[in-house]
Amino acid sequence: MICDPSVQQYSGYIDVSPEKHLFYWFFESRNAKPTSPLVVWLNGGPGCSSFSGLLGGVGPCRINDSGRGTLPNIHSWNSNAHVLFLDQPTNVGFSYGASVNSTIEAAIDTATFLRKFYDQFPQYSRCALHVMGESYAAHYVPAIAAQIVKDNKRNGKARSLPLASIAVGNGLFDMATQFMYLPEMACNSTYKSVANSEACMLMEKAGSDFAKSLEIARSSPSQETMVNATYAGYDILIPYQKAGGSPYDVRKTCTGGSLCDPYLNRISIYANQPWIRTDLGVRVDKEFVLCSTSVQDSFIYAGDEMIDSSQWLPMILAAGVRVLNYAGDADLICNWMGNKALMLGVQWPGNEQFAAAPDRQWVVDGQALGEIRSFGNMSFMRVYGAGHMVALDQPAASLAMVTQWLDHGAILAQSALS
């Protein structure tokens, strides 16, 4: 077995319909117990394979310098949980089939996938289910959880999926709220960025133009106005990128490659090796692309990027499902400022108490690794010293965070953990 030969693995396809075939790669926990939880991991894009997470800190191995092999990841999330990496929607990574261009359709397909996975592997049916992801997965994860909640009510206890929590890292829930914080993060964060005064001025102007586009989209909603607003949002980043900055880490310049990180380019080299395809049971004619621009474009042109996925959080919380939003505090595009503002704006019965809750230092083994704010089933976490991909930049903190969340949940609200 590849990547982590010490654990049981499964990989292949589950057909969510005759026309849709979703690829997955599953790793049992290194400390497998009957009570081990099951984490389903999704990357975003839209259009990016979950190999980004699997080989980018969340999974049990990382790519070596040549891109042809792997190295063990001692901070893998499967240290204490089963982890399933899913390429979704169709035509992302190794998945293929009829095209999908909306979060809602993708959520329906993923909920169907999970039911079929449990049917195929009933030994995991009692494992608490945690749906997690990063970036544009902030669209997918709440929608999937909401779909599961609805399906569970309809199907009854015997066919219910054991959804316990959701978690999203540096997510894009609502562009309208979060992108307003791009100039602030680029120009006034605790980190020194490449943005000079001219770039900051241009970002502020682009932010004003974005606000105007949002007003037009709200007053005259159509595919055209939604798409125009989406592009106006991304225009805020242009001055920063022209100055050479990475939208995924304000501490860095963009050095090329996916997410301005050459490491991620090696994932495609690894995944396209014939022996990898054979071992994983992948179609030999399916070329692996880490992030599909055609899938991303189809979501943009359908207006999907303007959806506010936080609309599903009150329903999820009401069902007793815990919600964690965590953010590396050096990311720009889905920065912690915008994510915190997003969470403070969620309308649920605990809104006032969550807003009044203190931000407490999160300390592990005597080291401050971030800040945590919690009330009830909702938590927001700022992770120090991490960019867009927390597990890649701060692997030890990432593992400590997810282990505490899975084992205890509310412990994250304490001011000191060791």
Regions found by a protein language model. Name each.
Residues 1-418:
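Terminal and linker regions of secretory-pathway proteins
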